[in-house]
Swiss-Prot record:
It is found in: Cytoplasm, Cytosol; Membrane. Belongs to the lipoxygenase family. PROSITE patterns: LIPOXYGENASE_1, LIPOXYGENASE_2, LIPOXYGENASE_3, PLAT. The gene is ALOX12. It holds the Pfam family Lipoxygenase. Changing residue 259 to K: Does not affect lipoxygenase activity. This is Polyunsaturated fatty acid lipoxygenase ALOX12. GO terms for molecular function: arachidonate 12(S)-lipoxygenase activity; arachidonate 15-lipoxygenase activity; hepoxilin-epoxide hydrolase activity; iron ion binding; linoleate 13S-lipoxygenase activity. Coiled coil: none annotated.
Amino acid sequence: MGRYRIRVATGAWLFSGSYNRVQLWLVGTRGEAELELQLRPARGEEEEFDHDVAEDLGLLQFVRLRKHHWLVDDAWFCDRITVQGPGACAEVAFPCYRWVQGEDILSLPEGTARLPGDNALDMFQKHREKELKDRQQIYCWATWKEGLPLTIAADRKDDLPPNMRFHEEKRLDFEWTLKAGALEMALKRVYTLLSSWNCLEDFDQIFWGQKSALAEKVRQCWQDDELFSYQFLNGANPMLLRRSTSLPSRLVLPSGMEELQAQLEKELQNGSLFEADFILLDGIPANVIRGEKQYLAAPLVMLKMEPNGKLQPMVIQIQPPNPSSPTPTLFLPSDPPLAWLLAKSWVRNSDFQLHEIQYHLLNTHLVAEVIAVATMRCLPGLHPIFKFLIPHIRYTMEINTRARTQLISDGGIFDKAVSTGGGGHVQLLRRAAAQLTYCSLCPPDDLADRGLLGLPGALYAHDALRLWEIIARYVEGIVHLFYQRDDIVKGDPELQAWCREITEVGLCQAQDRGFPVSFQSQSQLCHFLTMCVFTCTAQHAAINQGQLDWYAWVPNAPCTMRMPPPTTKEDVTMATVMGSLPDVRQACLQMAISWHLSRRQPDMVPLGHHKEKYFSGPKPKAVLNQFRTDLEKLEKEITARNEQLDWPYEYLKPSCIENSVTI
């Protein structure tokens, strides 16, 4: 006879406990024991009890549990179960971290990560095969729109598997803040009913409520050329700027601009010429909002790097050449102030479109969802890469499902306020998806390709590279615990299936764009996993968090333009500028959604600080602790740097980076 001490931990979320009774079994290498005790798990509690077992169970392999219900199935969120065997046996952990529903028996394997084996009689092998078979029935792929990455098969949030849903606190906060934003928007519209909307200062009428200190600075400085240029490096969208290697063919200089031609060529030769080309927007149909046509452009901006490391704009071409306009008007800083301001506003509007659709929605949200669905379909809970990745896919499926039903859906926010809404955003997504490459998701490759390595003022680039290095060391630490040689990587069928699922299925045959279809070495696996974690954490933070700072003052990044782009400079008046920028309704909606999507989440989990313990044993824990130490060091470095800056760059401070895409 032996005495076992069992601890059952229940989640701390609302409604995690259950009034239903839970039955437990212990399963070891030598036998199985049904525990007579039945418990009613309480929210946030760890219940402990001892039980005598008549036979020697040997090494514990599984805990089985079954929730009995009478009349009502009261779901239970089980964190984990730990068991201490007779004598001096070490405590054994059985991680769960999922909802227990219905009356089926749930088997929890001991938490040691295990690679797949080829022994069909192995209980763990049978368990992982059954788990994957069940999961592949639950987590199915769907096509939201042709030509885009696949998504989870869920038309609405209630269709999602329970374990991918928001916890109750998150749901309540998300829905309450939507209502709070709508109320503030309504109050602002009422406030402006009897007011004029004729000059830029009139935007002050709605610039109250939900904003940030940085947004206030943007309001004061947004017309400055230096701040306009700064945003290409460190604003809401630092992903478009690149160093010029030649003068763009679309930049047609008319006669009389020989001096500008010489200046551009000089900067090009010095390696100090940069460009931001929005050609992806060319030909995208513009929205029609409440019967009024909106407008889009595809600008090109040429900038130079001053000796002090600051960018300055040199010329803006709002539209590319076309048969009806072979030599489009070029706008210069020396032009009449309102004409130059309107040209910059067109650039900022175009940047808003690419930022939200290409770099935010596609490159972080949709890529993260592909990683999440493939992980649930291909990697069982015992797999070390599942244990490693699962904290980084929390809430991603629900936030994306909500986006498809509220933000980019027919009649959603984009249709109501954004110039690419009404279907243009889907066409833009398709174009961007066709250009999505593996290298573009990896900062060392992307920044090198764009010629931005080593720029002293490129704060996003600096912080992204530092984080990539830290995440890469973390990945390598975990991978080398389980894959000591390249042949072990090549011989893991679950891992290889996961790779194919992402590239060939989720990303729709993306091998032509550099994504791998198999892993042949430790280093190849580590690079891919680093991309996965970076995309789901740091990159999303860099792209998401700046929305309130840079978009709350609407003239700095107008969500739509209501008049065609100017073709002459002399005719631009304040009426032209105000007639082009968003109206009161659109501006209020932009402010509300910018706050809702980029505010700090109340249940935010910082990068690397998840509480779930999926791994067992000291070695994975040591790797995670070193990761946290490295992040703390970077936090101090960024904090010290930012204290010396007029415009601190906070988005990649580790404490500001969420552990997954949750908003």
